[in-house]
Regions:
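Conserved nucleotide-sugar phosphate-binding/catalytic loop shared by glycosyltransferases and other
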Residues: 9-11, 17-18, 36-37, 41-86
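Structural motif
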Residues: 11, 110-111, 158, 202
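Conserved catalytic-core segment of nucleotide-activated headgroup transferases in glycan assembly
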Residues: 26, 33, 192, 203-230
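A short helix->loop->beta-strand "cap" motif at the edges of active sites that frequently abuts
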Residues: 39, 124-126, 156-157, 181
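Short internal beta-strands
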Residues: 41-47, 158-164, 230
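Short, polar loop motifs at secondary-structure junctions
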Residues: 45-51, 112-119, 190-191
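Conserved nucleotide-sugar donor-binding subdomain of glycosyltransferases
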Residues: 78-119
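A nucleotide-sugar donor-handling region in carbohydrate enzymes
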Residues: 131, 136-143, 147-213
Length: 230
């Protein structure tokens, strides 16, 4: 635990990106660990991530920091769509950081854990950036996107990379040739635990992610299983 040297009851802000549910779910074991070590946790989440974490931690205080709203394209490559959304993303990051400063002062925040929210760094407060995508994949703009990615990551005190450095499950996503200045691999994290259960279903699909791609993928999955017998 990065804040282990702090006294108990220090106030930690945990803020996952609302881009599917993966960012929120992988913050759950981190929040549980903070609570176990007697930290005071405050959560900032939006959309589906808010509803998931509110159900998981109904007793925890939530604060609102409007996040980046990236749109997935229906027809164009994601890299092209992302390029045209850069001004909107940068403006949203600016407002994230401006709002954060007010929240840090109002709630006396001692530490920040940001899961892929680029604007949640602070000069006077220790801040952690969580990611497994150091090298965002793009056919056309890989180097430019990585420079922007690292520009913001290096503003944080430390960058937690959610992967095992040796096993490297995420491949080039989490272990590119060039790494940010403040990276630290923290291994694999999940809120799920292994347990033996009676098999009820033959197939199980777990879908998440931003729209409209999530629904498009759901339609593909449903179409592909039509010929499978019970």
């Amino acid at each position: 635990m990065y804040f282990r040297l702090m006294n108990s009851k220090k106030r930690i802000l945990v803020a996952p990106l609302n881009w599917g549910l993966g960012h929120a779910t992988r913050c759950i074991p981190i929040i549980n660990s903070l609570l176990k070590h007697n930290f005071k946790v405050i959560i900032s989440a939006n959309g589906r991530s808010f509803h998931l974490l509110k159900e998981e931690f109904p007793e925890i205080e939530f604060v609102k920091i409007k996040g980046v709203d990236v749109k997935y394209p229906r027809f164009f490559p994601m890299s092209i769509s992302l390029f045209f959304q850069i001004p909107k993303i940068l403006f949203a990051v600016y407002w994230e950081n401006k709002t954060l400063k007010k929240i840090v002062e109002k709630h006396k925040i001692d530490g920040i854990i940001s899961d892929n929210r680029f604007g949640l760094f602070h000069k006077k407060v220790k801040s952690i950036f969580i990611t497994h995508q150091l090298q965002i994949q793009s056919n056309y703009l890989k180097n430019s996107i990585q420079k922007i990615n690292y520009y913001f990551i290096n503003k944080f005190t430390i960058c937690w990379v959610m992967d095992d450095e040796e096993i490297n499950l995420a491949g080039e996503l989490s272990k590119p040739k060039k790494l940010p200045n403040n990276y630290k691999y923290i291994g694999l994290h999940s809120r799920l635990e292994f347990s033996k259960k009676e098999k009820i279903y033959k197939l199980c699909f777990i879908l998440s992610g931003p729209e409209p791609q999530r629904t498009s993928f759901e339609k593909i999955v449903m179409e592909s299983v039509k010929g499978i017998k019970e």
